[in-house]
Design a protein with these regions (language model features):
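Secreted/periplasmic carbohydrate-active enzymes, especially glycoside hydrolases
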Residues: 2-5, 9, 20-316
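Repetitive helical segments and hydrophobic/amphipathic motifs
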Residues: 13-14
């Protein structure tokens, strides 16, 4: 009986979601493109969002979220105004809303999500490709972080805020456009002439990523063409690594290992590529692939692999 009730509940939720997707439509047809015409609200921007540091496991949170517009300073609304298609700015046609956000207003988002069962024991990172301009983020009503800046990606470790089953994600955004403290471009609250319509709220992919406690957070790769060398600097996600851990980098040419190097945490890895280096140019679109797994030394465990991959462009 319990299983029947659970199956019925799941069917109802699926039915509601299907109906909601079927009801979505663009708000007008401004600046319509062939890609916009083919947009599937159930599969929005499915491409991996960080091609320069790719991991196999991730979960896309793009799609229909609930939204509300409220005066600045108010608490989270008990009821929301409707649905918005993330990651399109609320002013855009593809958001399904297409309204202007005043500098005296805040834009609220919320949705439910579940963490895949296979991620048990991992740290879970919540990524935003970009949110314009100031974003406050909560998971299950727990404040997980704040970010300012409309163009830079950011992420928060939300592991400690998660619960079993469904989780609630809430985002509050304030975007004063040309009336705020941020550097001003050509977006304007009253667009005309050369002044553009503002781009407010979430406007790049939102996604989840499982990582080990010891993981690579970011990488910087500097080529030295004269010496046929790459310098790789990695920033790790933990301030204290277990003893014996180090970073190892491998460079591949169409799947074939051509060079490798290693260094302890905090030090750069210098890798010399043997033979004639294949340089990238507009005429020869060659790309080396660089993989950075975690390695172990002696008997000390390092807690699994970091599993990071990056494309290396060596320009002529």
């Amino acid at each position: 009986m319990r299983m029947k009730k659970l199956a019925l509940a799941c069917a109802l939720v699926l039915g509601l979601q299907t109906t909601s997707l079927a009801q979505w439509k663009p708000a007008g047809d401004r600046i319509k493109t062939e890609w916009g015409e083919k947009l599937d609200p159930a599969n929005v921007l499915p491409e991996y969002p960080r091609p320069m540091m790719e991991r196999k496991e991730w979960k896309n949170l793009n799609g229909l979220w609930n939204y509300a517009i409220r005066p600045c300073g108010e608490a989270e609304p008990k009821t929301y105004d409707g649905e918005i298609l993330v990651p399109f700015a609320i002013e855009s046609s593809l958001s399904g809303v297409g309204v202007h956000l005043e500098d005296s207003q805040e834009l609220w988002y919320t949705r439910q999500f579940e963490v895949p069962a296979g991620w048990k024991g991992k740290r879970v990172l919540l990524h935003f490709g970009a949110v314009d301009w100031r974003a406050h983020v909560w998971v299950n009503n727990i404040n997980v972080g704040k970010h300012e800046g409309g163009y830079a990606p950011f992420c928060f470790d939300i592991t400690d805020a998660l619960q079993k089953g469904s989780n609630k994600l809430t985002v509050r955004v304030w975007d004063p456009t040309n009336n705020g403290p941020q550097p001003v471009g050509k977006q304007a609250n009253r667009p005309q002439g050369i002044w553009y319509t503002a781009v407010s709220g979430i406007w790049q992919t939102v996604w989840l990523e499982p990582v080990n406690e010891n993981h690579i957070a970011s990488m910087k790769i500097t080529p030295d063409i004269d010496l046929n060398r790459l310098r790789i600097e990695a920033r790790t996600g933990e301030s204290e690594w277990k003893k014996g851990c180090r970073l190892e980098a491998e460079v591949y040419d169409n799947g074939k290992l051509v060079a490798s190097g290693a260094a302890v945490r905090g030090e750069a890895i210098d890798i010399t590529i043997p033979g004639e280096v294949k340089l990238w140019s507009p005429d020869t679109f060659f790309i080396y692939t660089q993989s950075t797994p975690e390695t172990k030394r002696h008997r000390n465990g390092c807690g699994g692999q970091l599993c990071s991959h990056e494309k290396v462009l060596v320009q002529a």
